[in-house]
Amino acid sequence: MRISLTKTAKPSKKAILWGIAYLIFYQFLFSYVLGFLENFLPEPLDIIEVNLIFSLTNVTAVVLIFRKYLLQTLREARYRIPAILGYALLAVLGTMYLSELVSNLVWQLNPDYYNVNDVGIDLMLLENRPMVILMTVILAPITEELLFRGLIFRSLFDRSKVLAYVVSMCLFSFIHLTNYIGYLDIQWLGLAFLEYLPAAYCLAFAYHNSGSILSPMLVHALVNMISIGLF
């Protein structure tokens, strides 16, 4: 059964402001702060350690910022289990189908294209599989769904459903590319942007229709499990 999102839990204005501030810090400043602090360590951190610190700090900060919203979501969830699970399943299937269509289009536009993020994750999997699973299947879905669906999508939805979809989808896709701006050409970045849109749409769809942020969290976790070969 479809749930009206306007009648469900919503982050407070204070949480929204803190969330926006942290989103900016998380994306544009955190890596520099971490790099500065690393100078005081006796040995440099390896890539797994850096990403784990990044992931744990992000999930802790975001959960603290949105703790009241999360608690209200959990209280509402017991009445929405069928919707949470049902729309999560639809969104996973939709993500796989739409991603395949977009990937085929991308490869037709550039047969040499490959997703740089996926390559990085594959390399980390070879180094420390359990830690990568923790980061991609548990930590990333919580952090990213609270920020992009809970913060961006939900705060815009009451004003405009279309705006909520467009802004959350574009930001979600853009955020996954920022580390490569200046290193990859504009065509490559554009193709990568397109690749993230199906998932961004389906995650917003799951939240919109289930009325619970738990649904896109579940979708995100399952899609990441599939992408790293756990299914």
What is each stretch, according to the model?
Residues A61-V62, S103, W107, F231:
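Alpha-helical transmembrane segments and their lipid-water interface positions
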Residues W18-Y69, N115-L123, M131:
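Alpha-helical transmembrane segments in multi-pass membrane proteins
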Residues Y22, Y26-F30, L34, F54-V62, ...:
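Alpha-helical transmembrane segments of multipass membrane proteins
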Residues N39-L45, L71-A140:
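Juxtamembrane helix-loop-helix connectors linking adjacent transmembrane helices
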Residues V63-T73, A206-N209:
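Structural signal for the C-terminal ends of transmembrane alpha-helices
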Residues E100, E127-F231:
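Transmembrane helix-loop-helix hairpins at the membrane interface
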Residues Y22, Y26, V50-F54, Y87, ...:
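Alpha-helical transmembrane segments of multi-pass integral membrane proteins
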Residues R2-F25, I47, Y69-E100, D158-L163:
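Interfacial transmembrane-helix boundary/kink motif in multi-pass membrane proteins
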